[in-house]
């Protein structure tokens, strides 16, 4: 959030802020940070640095991005460069491969608590992120079982997204409906960002129900 706030007034300042954070603990950052650094560098008039971040992400780390994010205006200075085009082509192919293999994942394997909390991630997140975000709410209570539903649509390397359409929410609705007959005393569903939309659509347009919705 600080990076985005700084970028509103100064791309160079935002770039330096994020770069400092990355250099202080590089292992804590992944594909999205490299992408932000590339965009900030491009928008700050540093095309070589922008290209270097994309090279590191795509060529060195074997990550990939959704095709449309690599057409961002901040990356426009790179659009005619052969290396950028080659990197984008490689990323696009990896994305297509990921889409062809991907499917929705529901972590539930069986009932082992009285109550269930179903976590729904937001865009640029995944099921593991959702579980980690909501785990502190439940604490170490043995009466609650935490599960997550992950979208079938890749957003980037290791992350997924929901579409605001008439189909994407179906995976969430199906997970909710499957849980209704498992004998839980209470079912609570928590969503973040786009996950909130998926939960609301599930309740509005299907027979999926829960005892409480928590929307962030």
Model-predicted regions and their roles:
Residues 115-182:
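Serine-hydrolase catalytic machinery in alpha/beta-hydrolase-like enzymes
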Residues 59, 63-116, 197:
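A domain-start/cap signature at the N-terminus of enzymes
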Residues 185-216:
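Primarily recognizes the serine-hydrolase "nucleophile elbow" in alpha/beta-hydrolase
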């Amino acid at each position: 959030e600080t990076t985005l706030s700084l970028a509103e007034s100064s791309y160079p300042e935002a770039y330096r802020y994020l770069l400092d954070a990355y250099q202080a603990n590089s292992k804590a950052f992944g594909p999205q940070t490299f992408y932000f650094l590339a965009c900030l560098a491009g928008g700050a008039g540093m095309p070589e640095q922008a290209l270097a971040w994309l090279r590191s992400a795509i060529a060195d780390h074997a990550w990939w991005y959704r095709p449309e994010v690599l057409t961002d205006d901040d990356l426009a200075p790179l659009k005619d460069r052969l290396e950028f085009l080659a990197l984008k082509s490689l990323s696009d192919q990896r994305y297509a491969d990921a889409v062809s293999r991907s499917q929705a994942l529901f972590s539930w394997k069986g009932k082992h608590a009285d109550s269930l909390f179903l976590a729904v991630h937001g865009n640029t997140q995944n099921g593991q992120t959702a579980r980690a975000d909501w785990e502190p709410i439940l604490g170490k209570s043995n009466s609650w079982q935490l599960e997550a539903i992950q979208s079938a649509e890749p957003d980037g390397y290791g992350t997924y997204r929901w579409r605001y359409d008439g189909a994407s929410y179906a995976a969430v609705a199906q997970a909710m409906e499957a849980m209704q007959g498992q004998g839980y005393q209470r079912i609570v569903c928590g969503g973040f960002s786009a996950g909130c939309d998926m939960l609301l659509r599930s309740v509005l347009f299907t027979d999926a129900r829960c005892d409480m919705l928590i929307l962030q």
